[in-house]
Amino acid sequence: MMTYEYILVRYGEMTTKGKNRSKFVSTLKDNVKFKLKKFPNIKIDATHDRMYIQLNGEDHEAISERLKDVFGIHKFNLAMKVPSELEDIKKGALAAFLQVKDDVKTFKITVHRSDKRFPMKTMELLPEIGGHILENTEDITVDVHNPDVNVRIEIRSGYSYIMCGEHMGAGGLPVGVGGKVMVLLSGGIDSPVAAYLTMKRGVSVEAVHFHSPPFTSERAKQKVIDLAQGLTKYCKRVTLHLVPFTEVQKTINKEIPSSYSMTVMRRMMMRITEQIAEERNALAITTGESLGQVASQTLDSMHTINEVTNYPVIRPLITMDKLEIIKIAEEIGTYDISIRPYEDCCTVFTPASPATKPKREKANRFEAKYDFTPLIEEAVANKETMVLQTVEVVAEEEKFEELF
């Protein structure tokens, strides 16, 4: 019985790129290679319009599961490679069809003749190949409109690829082609989703988390570490900066009117994050804000908060409602971590009546009464930085270190 020998990857949005497409292809190949480190026998060939992964006996199902999480992949197919001879193509199409699930009742054949010198036309090939499958199966019919399985055949010079089992990729662009941003990672539901959607646009992320011991616990800190760890499923690594925020918050609580304490706190976070962004050569700041969700996420609040940074502030969730955000969080595996009942620094000092329409003039006037600069610099200087990778990669590195 024939087995799958290749996975053919289609790029999707990357095909709209022009002269710089080679950069996108190269980055995607590098990301796929990193994602599939556990499979040493594979060989990856990335061309201008698609990628070919030669399996060489590796587990195609396990590899397929990993490819689903790689940004830049639109779709991919399991494939067999056969000589470009009619009988070989017919046998290969039947073998590929027989490997799909038992509950399949209908199919169609799709043929693409990349080699126009092949002696038979597409309309001549369809009944030949389809008829061969019908003759060698039972209770199977052709459905060209809504088939259970589409047997795709790509005829090239000398050899042909036969594909079944189409899988959807993660879409978007390869992580790394779009620069780097700092993501404010609070520990809630929204910010990990914002990080995920930012990565989907090809942007590398580093996370900044503000914690305020003893008001926030070690369990709350670990929760954020686990969230950052979870995001490594979609990239090579996530660098997490843990910023001590206790003194800043205590001073805000003491010096700033309570109605403006939330606004000023967010402004301080932006100032600190901007300094870290400068150190780390990041080009923007990403937040998990959704318009109108809480008092600090009104247009007036965002207008006042934005004043303190010259960096672009990316808000991927800005027009989403909570249910849409939760749906994505569940799909990417961060929801169950986010709902762990540990408070973060934004909740422990929440004012009773925060201003929903704060003004820049008032915020500046309140802040001018106290010099926050030393506190900001101290918070940046005392941050804890850790680099997180997928559990598999960490295990491999530890195993390698044990050899020495």
Curated annotation (Swiss-Prot):
Keywords: ATP-binding, Cytoplasm, Nucleotide-binding, RNA-binding, Thiamine biosynthesis, Transferase, tRNA-binding. Pathway: Cofactor biosynthesis; thiamine diphosphate biosynthesis. One of its GO terms (cellular component) is cytosol. It is an enzyme of class 2 (transferase). Its main location: cytoplasm. It is found in: Cytoplasm. This is Probable tRNA sulfurtransferase. It comes from Bacillus cereus (strain G9842).
